Amino acid sequence: HNYGDHSSVSEQFRDSASMHSGRYGYGYNGMDLSVGRSGSGHFGSGEXXRSYXAGASAAPAEPRYSQPATSTHSPPPDPLPCSAVAPLPGSDTHHGGKNSLGNSSGCSANCGSTHISSREGVGTASAAEEDAPASSEQAGAQSEPSPAPPAQPQIYPWMRKLHISHDNIGGPEGKRARTCYTRYQTLELEKEFHFNRYLTRRRRIEIAHALCLSERQIKIWFQNRRMKWKKDK
C-alpha cells in the first residue's frame, strides 16, 4: 500500500536548482525553502517518482506476504504429518515453491516442538533419576551411625601435662606440674639466695632471663628456699 503521492513529495523536497543557480551563479543542490518553486527538478524527480510508482504498482505482491499469517507463524490446530504435505496443483512454480517452503517451515516448527517436548520429558526423567539416588544416599547416610573420633574423647587435661618440659615452661594451668631445675639453675639460685634472701622485681627479671625461667618460678623457688632456711635454723 502506498502512503501518499511520490511525485508530489519529490517535487516538494528535491526542487532546488533553478532558482539558486540563477541567483548565486553556480549550481546549488540544497533544499529550497522559498515559496515559489518551479516545476522542473534538478535530479529528475518527476521521472524517478513516476518510474518508482510504476515499478511499485507493476511488481506483484510476493506470495510469502500474500499468504495468511496463520500459515507461516502459527501451526494449524490439527497439522498433517510431514510426509502428507503436498503443494497445491493449480499454483505456478514460484508460488508452489513458496508454498512448499512455508509448509516445510511449519512442519519443521511442529517437529521441532515435538523434539523439544521429548527432550524436556527426557530431562525431567533424568532429573528424577538423579534425585532418587541422592535421596537414597541421604537415607543410607542417616541410617549408618556416624563414627566418633577415637582419640579425642580419651584425651584429658591431666594427660597433657605428662610431657611438659621442666626447664622453660611455667605458669598455672589448673594443677601445675612440678618444675625440675637443672644443676646449673639450682647452683645460680643458691648463689643468689646466699647473698640476698629477698629479691627485687628488677633482679628477679634479670635472673629469669639469665636462667631461661619465668618470674613466677623464681619467686616460688625463693619462697620455698626461705621456708626451708627458717625450718633448718
Curated annotation (Swiss-Prot):
GO cellular component, one term: nucleus
Residues making up the signal peptide according to the UniProt record: none
CDD domains registered for this protein in UniProt: homeodomain
Bias kind Polar residues: ranges: 1-11
Location of region: Disordered: 1-101, 118-154
SUPFAM superfamilies according to UniProt: Homeodomain-like
Pfam families in alphabetical order: Homeodomain (PF00046)
Recorded GO MF terms: DNA binding; DNA-binding transcription activator activity, RNA polymerase II-specific; DNA-binding transcription factor activity; DNA-binding transcription factor activity, RNA polymerase II-specific; RNA polymerase II cis-regulatory region sequence-specific DNA binding; sequence-specific double-stranded DNA binding
Compositional bias ranges of the Low complexity kind: 45-65, 133-145
Entry annotated with the keyword Transcription regulation: yes
Keywords, sorted A to Z: Developmental protein, DNA-binding, Homeobox, Nucleus, Transcription, Transcription regulation
DNA-binding region: 174-233
Subunit structure: Forms a DNA-binding heterodimer with transcription factor PBX1.
Function recorded in the entry: Sequence-specific transcription factor which is part of a developmental regulatory system that provides cells with specific positional identities on the anterior-posterior axis. Also binds to its own promoter. Binds specifically to the motif 5'-CYYNATTA[TG]Y-3'.
Similarity annotation: Belongs to the Antp homeobox family.
UniProt protein name: Homeobox protein Hox-A5
Organism the protein comes from: Rattus norvegicus (Rat)
The organism's taxonomic lineage, starting at the top: Eukaryota, Metazoa, Chordata, Craniata, Vertebrata
